[in-house]
Regions:
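N-terminal low-complexity or simple alpha-helical regulatory segments
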Residues: 2-84
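Long, amphipathic alpha-helical coupling/dimerization segments that relay conformational signals between
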Residues: 2, 6, 65-150
């Protein structure tokens, strides 16, 4: 796995990436509900994801994080955070992570380019799973409320 060095780079610099994420959450006007959540909670979620990225990307381990994000979807519904804001936050984490790697100025050789491409593909699949499970949890909580009031 050529992207292992890049995954480790993300894990080591998770605090810097998280700081960038939190700045963006406060900058985007359409994330009003999300930015009202405690910053400590947002920071902890991001750092847990980033500092253990290598573990989460191993086959079989991603399901553990997916379950956590299904529970997070339910929590976000209960907190009144719109679904689009919750999904947007995941997109921002992925974007900040990939941007950080691209900014490191590695010499552009074929192996390094391949490693970055491999990382983007692996991270993309992982985040797709997280989004899917977040939405599933959110919809499950929404259905429960809808059926209770029907």
């Amino acid at each position: 796995m050529l992207s292992g060095k890049l995954v480790r780079l993300i894990e080591v610099h998770q605090q810097e990436i998280t700081d960038r994420l939190l700045r963006d959450i406060h900058r985007y006007p359409d994330l009003t509900h999300l930015r009202q959540l405690p910053e400590a909670e947002l920071r902890e979620r991001s750092q847990n994801l980033l500092e253990n990225l290598g573990y989460w990307l191993v086959d079989g381990n991603e399901e553990e994080m997916a379950r956590k994000y299904e529970t997070l979807g339910k929590s976000r519904f209960d907190d009144g955070v719109p679904l689009h804001e919750s999904v947007h936050a995941l997109f921002l984490i992925k974007e900040k992570m990939i941007d950080f790697v691209g900014e490191q100025g590695f010499p552009p050789d074929v192996l390094e380019l391949y490693a970055e491409e491999e990382l983007e593909r692996r991270v993309g699949r992982f985040f797709d799973l997280l989004v899917l499970r977040l939405v599933r949890g959110y919809e499950g909580a929404w259905r429960k409320v809808a059926y209770a009031t029907a």
